[in-house]
From Swiss-Prot:
Disulfide bonds join C43-C85, C124-C168. This is Putative high affinity immunoglobulin gamma Fc receptor IB. The lineage of its organism: Eukaryota, Metazoa, Chordata, Craniata, Vertebrata. CDD domains: Ig1_FcgammaR_like (cd05752), Ig2_FcgammaR_like (cd05753). Keywords: Adaptive immunity, Cell membrane, Disulfide bond, Glycoprotein, IgG-binding protein, Immunity, Immunoglobulin domain, Membrane, Receptor, Repeat, Signal, Transmembrane, Transmembrane helix. Residues 258-280 are annotated as: Disordered. Its main location: membrane. It comes from Homo sapiens (Human). The gene is FCGR1BP.
Amino acid sequence: MWFLTTLLLWVPVDGQVDTTKAVITLQPPWVSVFQEETVTLHCEVLHLPGSSSTQWFLNGTATQTSTPSYRITSASVNDSGEYRCQRGLSGRSDPIQLEIHRGWLLLQVSSRVFMEGEPLALRCHAWKDKLVYNVLYYRNGKAFKFFHWNSNLTILKTNISHNGTYHCSGMGKHRYTSAGISQYTVKGLQLPTPVWFHVLFYLAVGIMFLVNTVLWVTIRKELKRKKKWNLEISLDSGHEKKVISSLQEDRHLEEELKCQEQKEEQLQEGVHRKEPQGAT
């Protein structure tokens, strides 16, 4: 029973956040920014185990920054890349791909991959926050939203149909189109594996372990019993041989005694025959 209890304690509950894994958040919350802009990455852990020292990685290489916040001032193209972080004994975070752009207009988003049902916020951002009007948002080359004055666009609940390539355009002194074209992916919901499945799985493993143990013990006892039985047969066989040998010896002695008695009788008869002759 203790074995099954231990197995049940190992059962993971799907749908819960891994509280020991670091998570990167951005301020402002966009993964694409213009050159010379400032962006700060924060390394956060819900339940931080052990030491709170922080390590940052850019394109797989450890950086010299050891604080929970990684601040980039006056961003340049060299700051583009894949960022990860780790705090103390936490697991390393999922990567954040930061892009630094040049141009007059930029379509910004907080992530490039979303789970179905999550909100998607888009921002058509002008260089140095210049005023832009008659803003159009495009998906897969087709305009789908118009704002007379620049405004952020929020899709409250994303679904698979929102997958595609996005960009924006707007008017300033001239007609501008966003620098770079961003591909955004909406992943379908993955149904969590029910807890009962894990319980049944570990229960089956426990039963298999128990059955194997019982079989092993049974086979071991059977082997010991057979070994003892063979030994007893061997001993009995040896005893029978000794008894037979003893009987054979007794028979041989009896035969010798009979022969001896017969010889004595013959001698006595010979003596009796000689006595009458002497008397005559």
